Amino acid sequence: MAATVAVDNLNPKVLKCEYAVRGEIVIHAQRLQEQLKTQPGSLPFDEILYCNIGNPQSLGQQPVTFFREVLALCDHPDLLQREEIKTLFSADSISRAKQILAMIPGRATGAYSHSQGIKGLRDAIASGIASRDGFPANADDIFLTDGASPGVHLMMQLLIRNEKDGILVPIPQYPLYSASIALHGGALVPYYLNESTGWGLETSDVKKQLEDARSRGINVRALVVINPGNPTGQVLAEENQYDIVKFCKNEGLVLLADEVYQENIYVDNKKFHSFKKIVRSLGYGEEDLPLVSYQSVSKGYYGECGKRGGYFEITGFSAPVREQIYKIASVNLCSNITGQILASLVMNPPKASDESYASYKAEKDGILASLARRAKALEHAFNKLEGITCNEAEGAMYVFPQICLPQKAIEAAKAANKAPDAFYALRLLESTGIVVVPGSGFGQVPGTWHFRCTILPQEDKIPAVISRFTVFHEAFMSEYRD
């Protein structure tokens, strides 16, 4: 009897879905990593450097001490009864852990919580949002999630009814969006960021793409904006954000604001402004614009990817729609409690009067300053290489250089049945052990080629990364020179 489950009888939406950040090149890298373990010395490098994904602690970044102290005490509250605890943990981490435990049913991080998350933790997040923006925030608008990604899936599930429902997505884009739209059976409507203006978002182009989609019978439901940009690293100007908000209001679009890199800004002339702040600054209220804002504990200076914490905040949705959002959230019961606690700590960190503040601030400032130096070093190194141009990384955790490949390399890629930038990235991996993501996995202007590289290898390893990359690139260009 034939297998009851085969590729040709799977859900076609699953087959259509792709996620390049953990695609073919990463799978090959994992095979090479196993080879290094079982056959040391068999490859021209001795380690795999995963520069494909924003996963800071996997590349050596240390967690923030205050956050981990609070988590440890919440996970093992019996420690709070021991006298020696006062010599091992700061006074404010002890007091914060006690406050948080008092909010949790049964004082147990292994218990289920309310489907939106623990109310006291949502209160703390709302307070942090209000402090950041200068406008009130409400805990009832906040849904705690296992990272930001489940919140994106939830909204796609809510908004997409069939293949004629479209979502405007920036190109280049984070593949979560194309994958989620495909899984839920919708249409991705691309709008192109302008590489020549530092990956600028031009509402005139968004308008053009919107009108084109509507002319094809697509009902465009929402606009995705990623700020700071992933994979492109730009930070939107405040004036640009005002234009975007007005555009969404005028066109009747939900604004999906991916703001998970809000702490990652490396240039003095740019500042993060949340879209919630922009909406309220324009005087828009609940009747004017549906807005969903995403935040995560995985990025920023904290980099707690494996803890799976995050939230989305909804404003501008009617009570009946909110009931449906809550219903979808309830199907998953709740997000993990550790991630919920971390999200509250990220949005409500130590204050200047707290015992931990000096060490917390030193850790935060040190991490962000080092990331800025690494971004600048990689940008400078890539711009020195033949055929590569790299815009300034104003924020986020990546550089996204454009690479002008020789025609012979493009032909070799075609013969190998690969996109030219994927061919380049695969050769880079096999020669150096460095893992990057080809630009074709994010979308790009047709006829251009890019790759995304994280800025996350530890600072003392950056010179070696640059050296290995430079040697490879020069050899590659010589091999395929026209």
UniProtKB/Swiss-Prot annotation:
- Establish whether keyword Protein biosynthesis is in the entry: no
> Which Pfam families has this protein been placed in?
Aminotran_1_2 (PF00155)
Record-level GO BP terms: biosynthetic process; L-alanine catabolic process
Record PTM N6-(pyridoxal phosphate)lysine, positions in chain: 299
Which SUPFAM superfamilies does this chain map to?
PLP-dependent transferases (SSF53383)
GO MF: L-alanine:2-oxoglutarate aminotransferase activity; pyridoxal phosphate binding
Give the family, as the similarity comment puts it. Belongs to the class-I pyridoxal-phosphate-dependent aminotransferase family. Alanine aminotransferase subfamily.
Protein name listed in UniProt: Alanine aminotransferase 2
| Organism name | Hordeum vulgare (Barley)
